[in-house]
Amino acid sequence: AIVLVPEIALSPQTVSRFESRFGDTVAVMHSRMTAGERFDQWEAVRLGKKRVVVGARSALFCPMATLGLIIIDEEHESTYKQESAPRYHARDVAAWMAQRTGAALVLGSATPSIETLCRCKVDDMWHRVVLPTRANGKPMPEVRILDMAKEFGRGSRSMFAKELQDN
């Protein structure tokens, strides 16, 4: 399994959760590690000694012998987008890898990206699972997409839809 977190700072708590379940088969990969540390983790994954990789977007490229699951935590975060060459979005690479290997792909977010929401509507392979309440028990907020082209077509010059202004 590959588990992506948007920030290196989130790695320790995520790693500890997975280590409590999977023990020493969990590898960690991120850019703050030395080249030697990254190589050791990469090699342990390649040899099958580590079966779960937790890290930032570069963790996607670990040589997993068998890949059954990819999890992207907080999939809406912009940090999953690589701006310098080679340019890629970790979500798109993960989707391609999952399709190619038959792995399950789980995108987690309380506020999913528009791209992911759209894909769930138009692609039968993508399914949206909505939790009815938050972890703290509070209800989820109502979310609606408003068509600003219609607002402007009605002569509005505001950057906020009338529906937002009325509430």
Identify the residue ranges that each predicted region occupies.
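A short beta-strand-to-loop transition that corresponds to the Sensor-1 phosphate-sensing loop
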Residues: 7-8, 56-58, 74, 109-112, ...
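Switch/connector loops and helix/strand junctions flanking conserved nucleotide-binding motifs
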Residues: 11-14, 36-39, 62-63, 78-81, ...
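Conserved interdomain linker/interface between the two RecA-like ATPase lobes of SF2 helicase motors
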Residues: 91-167
